[in-house]
Amino acid sequence: MKKLFIILVSLLVTASVYSQTYEVNKFYPELGGYVIKTDGTNGVVVAMQDQGAANWYDTEAMVNDASKHDANGAKFNDWRLPTIDELKLVYLLKQSIGGFIDTIYWSSSWDAYGAVWNLQFGGNGNLPDNESPINVFNVRAVRAF
């Protein structure tokens, strides 16, 4: 009976350790960035710094280059461009996240005509636009957790 009790307590402690919950609009170093959406346990974080500027075709290598992330983000290799909907969430939280410049940021979303959706982070220009993938715009990576 004592053995069963110890096993049950161990399972309870283990479950509580692994049931970390996360909130939107908060930085979590262990996730590598700032939470932009979550269901409490799973979600998406955005990197804490831009990865640079590039044409769309060069962004995949850029987002997974550890040297282009802060120390927390460099621990992960599953970074990607945000979808246009995720990029809109990043825009809404840009003041809290910080480090953005007034420029255009790439998304991973394509339109039906071969252009890529992007978002202007400067001024009031927060409406999505679509551009040729050969243009050079800024990159801010996201990753799922």
Mark where each language-model region is.
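NAD-dependent ADP-ribosyltransferases
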Residues: 1, 83
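Sec-dependent N-terminal signal peptides
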Residues: 4-14
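C-terminal, surface-exposed recognition/capping segments
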Residues: 84-145
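Secondary-structure boundary motif
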Residues: 10, 68-72, 96
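Long alpha-helical, hydrophobic tracts
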Residues: 2-4, 117
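Extracellular adhesion/carbohydrate-recognition regions
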Residues: 19-79, 107, 114-122, 133, ...
